């Protein structure tokens, strides 16, 4: 896949990742495609090795784009092009040294929000850019204003932690507005497809439909990453396991600290990979169990309220896909040589078409899609 990335970007991304200088890698126009490529490659390797398909995906910041590529919404090539452009726009939006980001620990959310409001001026802004957990946030904005908040924290709460991040721009802050406006135009040039599974938006902390994709990615540039709310959503949905893809284990640690009942795994840990492999290997459902689970999801989709009054769209987007799913259910029961993985992919895609055509909300879609047989209710997390 690195060859495809090199061809897409017009430079040797593999060499940049493994041999590039620290200065080159820290430029966000290089960092973003590098992280996306490594994350997608790791996901594909894990999928082939473990034979698992996630029921849902969530990515933190840039990781949301990696999740969209892994879920099939964007092609690998388009994903690389988008984040390369995104990185350039972010880098150009703020002059070097003007912006800053800092990770803050052990400061209550309300207190930090208040200090950001009090420290901001017409010419120097500072906001919370990431709500990572109850005890961890990231602030971003003009360097002067970020510095004022940092001094307040150190003076008022000595036991709190403040660590400046080595980034080239203040992401997820109002300073990215000009970059967001330009990115919006670029997003319209790329094909958006039905994904294999739902992806959670950083802006809403809920799965979104294709019609919301461009607007939410636009807003993600200037709005905070609601990761704490994302973890709460996963917990309330009954998620039992998460697998983190990509460099480091930041999201795994955040999940362990916040919802310890959810089992967490990371691709970098060989022992955890072996454990996952044994789980998935022993978790094969009987064909009849698979067929029954799909039928239950299909019935839920069939009786769900329809909000689409266009009969042509209803026929093409609801009636025909439901017929196709019924035919596939019979194939599952009868054809012992059937490729189960690709068949389940196809059924998930068809069910998503039905739910979208009926104009169901993201939450309604999520409840029905989760009825499909999955790899032990596993969610993939990808750090940006």
Label the predicted regions.
Residues 1-114, 242-270, 310:
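FabD-like malonyl-/acyl-CoA
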């Amino acid at each position: 896949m690195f060859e495809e990335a090199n061809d897409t970007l017009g430079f040797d991304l593999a060499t940049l990742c493994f041999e590039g200088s620290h200065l080159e890698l820290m430029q966000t126009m290089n960092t973003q495609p590098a992280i996306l490529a490594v994350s997608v490659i790791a996901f594909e390797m894990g999928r082939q090795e473990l034979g698992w398909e996630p029921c849902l995906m969530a990515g933190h910041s840039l990781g949301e784009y990696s999740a969209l590529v892994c879920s099939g919404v964007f092609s690998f090539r388009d994903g690389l092009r988008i984040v390369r452009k995104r990185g350039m726009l972010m880098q150009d939006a703020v002059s070097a040294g003007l912006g800053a980001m800092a990770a803050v620990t052990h400061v209550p959310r309300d207190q930090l929000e208040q200090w950001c409001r009090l420290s901001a001026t017409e010419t120097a802004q500072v906001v919370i850019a990431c709500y990572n957990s109850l005890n961890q946030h990231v602030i971003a904005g003009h360097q002067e204003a970020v510095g004022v908040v940092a001094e307040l924290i150190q003076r008022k709460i000595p036991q709190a932690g403040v660590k400046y991040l080595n980034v080239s721009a203040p992401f997820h802050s109002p300073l990215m507005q000009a970059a967001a406006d330009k990115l919006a135009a670029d997003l319209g040039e790329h094909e958006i497809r039905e994904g294999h599974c739902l992806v959670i938006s950083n802006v809403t902390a809920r799965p979104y439909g294709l019609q919301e994709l461009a607007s939410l990615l636009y807003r993600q540039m200037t709005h905070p990453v609601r990761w704490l709310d994302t973890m709460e959503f996963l917990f309330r949905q009954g998620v039992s396991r998460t697998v983190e893809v990509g460099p480091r284990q930041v999201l795994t640690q955040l999940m362990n600290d916040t919802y310890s009942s959810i089992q967490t795994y990371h691709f970098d840990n060989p022992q955890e990979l072996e454990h996952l492999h044994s789980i998935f290997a022993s978790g094969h459902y009987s064909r009849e169990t698979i067929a029954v689970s799909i039928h239950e999801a299909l019935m839920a989709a069939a009786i769900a309220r329809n909000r689409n009054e266009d009969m042509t769209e209803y026929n093409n987007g609801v009636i025909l896909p439901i017929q196709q799913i019924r035919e596939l259910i019979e194939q599952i029961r009868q054809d012992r040589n059937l490729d189960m993985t690709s068949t389940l992919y196809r059924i998930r895609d068809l069910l998503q078409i039905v739910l979208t055509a009926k104009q169901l909300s993201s939450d309604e879609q999520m409840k029905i899609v989760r009825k499909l047989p999955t790899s032990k209710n596993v969610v993939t997390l990808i750090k940006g």
